Structures are given as structure tokens and as C-alpha cells.
């Protein structure tokens, strides 16, 4: 809500695609201060980088992470050890902050839904996070919004994948992706032969065509 002190007038001038901010009347060094607390689920490297900015803006932060020595621990105002997938841990943590965000998508969405209903501002919103957490839902989202993506097929079990190969419905090579719990390359495998299939997780997944590309971008 108000990230600037009320007694500071801000005048923005746009000239040649540059923004000039002029602070008038009672200029102070804490003009970025806020009385609200930002909660961050996850205290890894990304959380630590986020805290670089919150400290510059004098934003009070609380971090929840299962690792008592998480990278973000030293840079936040309050640190709590807790399971990000545990409903009660996430809910109790969220009740102590004004705005809640994530550093990693592996968090308890049901707790976030309850917090949002009770007035806590959650970003990204829980319904968006549900899509982010599941690669099958992601692909369906791309397809329904006409966003170009590699062709794919969903499978509930690894046995179904094997059966599709036997029937000639799938051919090597292809990309196997775990529907959930995949991150930083984990849960993604380029499969070249039947032998490599045996090392894959047996749960829900999607099989994606192997495409050539020049550059990979993460947004």
C-alpha cells in the first residue's frame, strides 16, 4: 500500500524514455520504508537475491525454509524453520505477514488459498500457482491460449508410457517430464531407449516431442 511516506510528493517526468523522480518536501533517506511485512516461502539463492532489493527499500521480511542454514537466513529480518509443503507450517507463517510470495513453487497451495480468503495478499495467486506446479496443466494452458509449445501427451503411470511404445504410439527419442515436483532440471529426461525408461519415476508425467532450439529463456 503506501510504500512512500505520505508527506513526500513525487513528481515523475518522462523524457527520452527516461524517468526522473523528484522528491519534494521533507526528503528523508527512508522514503522507501514500509510498515508492512513481506513473507517469503523459501530461503534459497533466489530468496537471497530478492532480499538484496528489500533491504535497499527498507522492507521488513520474514522467510520460511526447511533448512536452518538457508542462504536467505542472514539477510532477512525474521527466519523460521518449517516445511514448505506442510499446511499448518505455511498457514501459521502466512498469518504473521501482510504480503506473501514464493521463492520456489513447491509449497502448500491449500494453505495459501485459506490465507488469501482471510485477507493475506498472496503473489502469485494460489490458482496461478496450481498451474505452475503441474507441467501437464502448464501445457494445457499454453495450448488453450494459442501459445506455441512442443506437442505432448499425458500419462498417469510409467506403465502406460511403456504400453504406448509397444503399440508404436511413441517413438524414441522423446522428452519425459514429471507432472509435478520438477525443478532445476530434476524431473526432465531425454529418453533415447527402453533401458532409460526404467530409471524414471512411475507417477503422472507428460511425454513431449524432442525439438531443436537455439536458445532457452526462463522468465
Region locations from a protein language model:
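ATP-binding N-terminal substructure of ATP-dependent carboxylate-amine bond-forming enzymes
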Residues: 25-128, 132-133, 137
Amino acid at each position: 500500500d503506501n510504500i512512500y511516506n505520505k508527506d513526500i510528493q513525487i513528481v515523475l517526468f518522462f523524457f527520452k524514455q527516461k524517468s526522473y523522480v523528484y522528491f519534494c518536501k521533507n526528503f528523508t533517506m527512508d522514503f522507501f520504508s514500509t510498515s508492512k511485512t513481506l513473507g517469503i516461502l523459501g530461503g534459497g539463492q533466489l530468496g537471497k537475491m530478492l532480499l538484496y532489493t528489500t533491504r535497499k527499500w527498507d522492507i521488513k521480511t520474514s522467510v520460511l525454509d526447511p533448512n536452518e542454514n538457508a542462504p536467505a537466513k542472514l539477510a532477512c529480518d525474521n527466519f523460521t524453520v518449517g516445511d514448505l509443503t506442510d499446511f499448518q507450517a505455511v498457514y501459521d507463517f502466512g498469518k504473521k505477514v501482510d504480503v506473501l510470495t514464493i521463492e520456489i513453487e513447491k509449497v502448500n497451495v491449500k494453505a495459501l488459498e485459506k490465507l488469501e480468503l482471510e485477507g493475506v495478499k498472496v503473489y502469485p495467486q494460489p490458482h496461478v500457482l496450481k498451474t505452475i506446479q503441474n507441467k501437464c496443466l502448464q501445457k494445457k494452458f499454453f495450448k488453450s491460449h494459442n501459445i506455441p509449445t512442443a506437442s505432448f501427451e499425458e500419462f498417469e503411470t510409467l506403465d502406460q508410457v511403456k504400453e504406448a511404445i509397444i503399440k508404436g504410439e511413441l517413438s524414441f527419442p522423446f522428452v519425459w517430464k514429471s507432472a509435478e515436483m520438477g525443478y532445476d532440471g530434476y524431473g526432465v529426461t531425454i529418453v533415447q531407449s527402453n533401458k532409460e525408461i526404467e530409471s524414471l519415476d512411475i507417477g503422472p508425467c507428460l511425454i513431449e516431442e524432442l525439438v531443436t532450439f537455439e536458445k532457452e529463456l526462463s522468465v
